[in-house]
Amino acid sequence: MSEASLSTYYTTIYPTKCPPDPRFLVSKEGLAFCCQIIGFISLPMHFFTGYCILMKTPATMKHVKLSLVNLNIWYIISQVIVSFFITSYNFYPSLASFSVGYATALNFPTVVQICILYTINDAVHVSITLLFEIRSSLILKNRFRISSSRGRGYWLAGNFFGTVFITSPVFFNLADQNAEKMKILEAIPCPSKEFFLEPITVFATSGAWNTYLLISRSLKSIYMLQIIFFTSCCIYYLVIVKTDQVSAQTRRIQARSFYGLIIQTLIPAAFTLIPSVLISSRSAPDQLVNNLVSISYAVHIVVGSLAILLVHHPYRLFIKSIFVKSKESVIVPVVSTSMFKVIK
């Protein structure tokens, strides 16, 4: 399919069939503006979270301090990339997108930008999974615990590079872009004008590549399977099986930390799951909803950092100490009026 066919569709069919969409958030400028505002507001919060982790983490949390620092660093990197450099403008439900960030202005190919975005997303997922692994391995009775730093290093490398290699072939096998765009127009006849004017990248979904995408997505769910496994270990050894070798206070502290980790993970996850459910429940695609998904993804990153502060008790106490000052008793001097009496 030639580029002329796509151009002909845009100049002849599109104006008569598709009325202009004046909504600001549908435009690439609206999406970029919202994500940049979120980025400017979020970065100070990320740095404050990093300060709390580095300076206010008590000795009882020393085993998870480095993993929290690691997660915070990847949150910061992800926020900068998503809010400023690679803000993804997606045409759901098709696998077509482009970036409205600064990386496009710097002439980075769209496929390279998407590859970078996927890689950073994988790093965040591995960092979250690492928190569950460490929480599980801190239980000495856990027969599945990773007890050595070398073993944990192999585990981290396998998780990160394994998922990156799984999805890499997709980025190096792009189909005929104009032909794929015409196929998308059959299902979505009235996309936003950016579909025709911007450097859209469409991933191959036909034939064997459709099967490969399904398999690769299934394999990427290994993050969730590992989290479920580590969670099961924690529940089994902290709640179901109780041993006299661990004091009740220690078990209570470990259980509280585990429950906090669950909440810390679920809070930001809700900001991505809810929009995804909203998209899947709609009968017709809406670019406004698509862009709201990208905005919610930018929001969920900073929500992840705030969840660290709100879930862990030492950080909550520090925040409270900033805003709530202890009341100081004010001494008001009392002067006797007898000193001012005039003796007649």
Curated annotation (Swiss-Prot):
Q: Where does this protein come from, organism-wise?
A: Caenorhabditis elegans
| Subcellular localization, as worded in the UniProt entry | Membrane
Which keywords does this Swiss-Prot/TrEMBL entry list?
Answer: Membrane, Transmembrane, Transmembrane helix
One matching Pfam family = 7TM_GPCR_Srh
Family membership noted in the UniProt record: Belongs to the nematode receptor-like protein srh family.
The record ties this protein, via PANTHER family, to: SERPENTINE RECEPTOR, SERPENTINE RECEPTOR, CLASS H-RELATED
Q: Which residues form the signal peptide?
A: none
GO cellular component terms attached to this protein's record: membrane
Which protein are we looking at? Serpentine receptor class H-72
The membrane-topology field of this record reads: Multi-pass membrane protein
